[in-house]
Structure formats: structure tokens, C-alpha cells
Amino acid sequence: MKFKILLPVFVLFLSSFVTLEAQNKVEVNSKQVSQMLLKSKKLIVLDVRTADEFNAGHIKGALNIDVRQTDAFSKIDKLNHNGKYIVYCRTNHRSGMAVEHMMQSGFKKVYQMMDGFPGWAATNFAYEK
């Protein structure tokens, strides 16, 4: 009898964590990011590609933390967890790793740019080298 009561309570408890994480991570595209950046100067853009990729072109003002470096997650952890971040790479693999880590580390709001830097460049939005 107790098991029948506890199981639904436990499932509800676990689902609240999944919902909370989903609320903190939002998938966006480069057009949405462009609009967001025009509306708010408080957004922090995080490019998780290699330094060579970053130097070849990146969104203006972006921070570069190469997620494949051994110290990448410790660098990410030093960022303000209450900030609003837009994270991108080239194909979503590296940005996905970074976003997952950020969610597990308690970052409040993270946007993953799903079309990556190629999507940004293809729309002819300004970028810097």
C-alpha cells in the first residue's frame, strides 16, 4: 500500500527536475539570437569552438572557451551562474556538452543556438575576426 502511494510521489518529484532543467535551457536559431542581442545588452555569448575557429570568425563580443580543453568546465564554472547565456559552436555537439554542463552546474538561463556559427554567417549577420 505504501509503495503505491510513494511511487507516484517519487515520479512527480523526479519530473519536476526535468521540467526545471527544460525551463532553464532554450533552443534558438541565429535569427532569434540576433533579435535577442538587439533587445538586451545583458546577454553573454559563449563560443565553445577552438581558438582557431573563433579567430576565423565569431559573433561580436563573444567569449571563447574551447569545450574540448581539459580546463573548459572549470572556466565555465567561474562565469556568473545568474547570467543569461547564448552558447554556440559549429554543429551543436560541443555547445550541447557545454549547455548540459551549465544546466547541471545551476546556471539559470542558457540559450543554445542550434544552427551554430555557420547558421549565423549564412544569414549575413555581422561577425568579427
Task: Describe each model-derived feature in a short phrase.
Residues 8-14:
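Hydrophobic helical h-region of N-terminal Sec-dependent signal peptides
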